[in-house]
């Protein structure tokens, strides 16, 4: 959001306590306010002054933050809940096969008519059956904001909460902040909320509605019998479970701990792995930094991965698990590809976490910084972290950020032109140059806008992309997109989500111009430029020779001069065909650079020195009662 949420909106709209109980059914809505969606489903039409005139009591805002703090003391090796298959049931043919190791068996625990029941087997198949509904059901929620990252979504949720609108963080695809469904649980209340938000200027909020005619139901088959249950737990005596996805009959993955199939907030199911954190790290560390890294770099990665997961256990509260298994959290592949060197690094640092003022740090890291790390607020909304400040990723004094901040465009382009003297210089992602055609850019941008129900989602022509603001670390803070229907801004990490060609926020952009095909090519002309030949930029045109501009300094006869003038008049203007993005780095660039840590490790840096380099002022200590996992911002 661009401005603080108006508290008057929250006071006026927290209506659930007095309305929800009587308006749960669409059919119970007041006469004259319902419309039909098309398959027999009724929904409330947008609420007008009639609804606003209702004398509705207000509920007081709660002081509780949008996400619950995890400030309790922790065990040395706590168990965590990881969503390893997050959207099981998205496809009708989704399948999972679970198996025990030789000599062991799986125990499946579930309920039948309220009674606990168990089944023992060595192999379990889980699949989906689509269940038609007798009548379509209206499924909807109010989306208050949409984000690329959890970090910005959490900041938005906290702001809405402070304004008196209970909010929850969801991830149906992109991260979103929803008006809390149990509070805004009737069509009338949701539409009243949305109308008032729009009236107050929060026009990016929208109602995500759909009529559901069938729902996925999960079932498992064991010992020749099929059981349809919404939730069940899978355990084994040695706490090792094999997994195969799809139609594979052979097991590729092995997980420690227990498994559970459970419903999520999106009408599908999640396979959750409950696992001790030290065993979890064996499935993270070798995939995050690679087994070929120097030992000290792997140890630093192990400490960061441990710190990161324990601080972020609140991410999926809406779905009743804690962390995911992909790059939105940390990649996690279980034990199948565990590496002896990584296991040794994990064991050597067991229980150690990185802290600041006895609280776990926000242990962010990325592949490659591009030569300079970013401040937290250079990438996301929220409060700055004192230990996440711009650091030039070099062991030599390559650049003085205080004297030459990269917020200045000339300074930034000079910095990006540097190729040598950095910790990451030998890695391909350190510097890059990527071009996308107008067609490719249109597809990317229109999908981004459509998913956010943006009014410009159906623009006809993309005219320009320009960086209008940078941070001192060089990260793009605002990009303006100009179309034939109007312009809009992309702020911070939304630029990477919407544009795609940039691999980080450390970039500048140039239009790609091409000469159109000649309408009447000369018989002997073999040097004309066509759409299939090399492109030129506006900078190329500006720096071109006088001859390229159609002006000759050599005296010529009148007839030739007249011909030249005629040719110049007929020369078409170059046309925009795409955009070129020039930059450096891969990922958000906050905290440790994994490729930079490689170099530091090779130079003899210990894991303590690597962590101090990227997180100045932090303290390494064991998990204890004195350490707070997360106490909110």
Task: Please provide the spans of the model-predicted regions.
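Conserved, single-site charged/polar hotspot
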Residues: 2-633
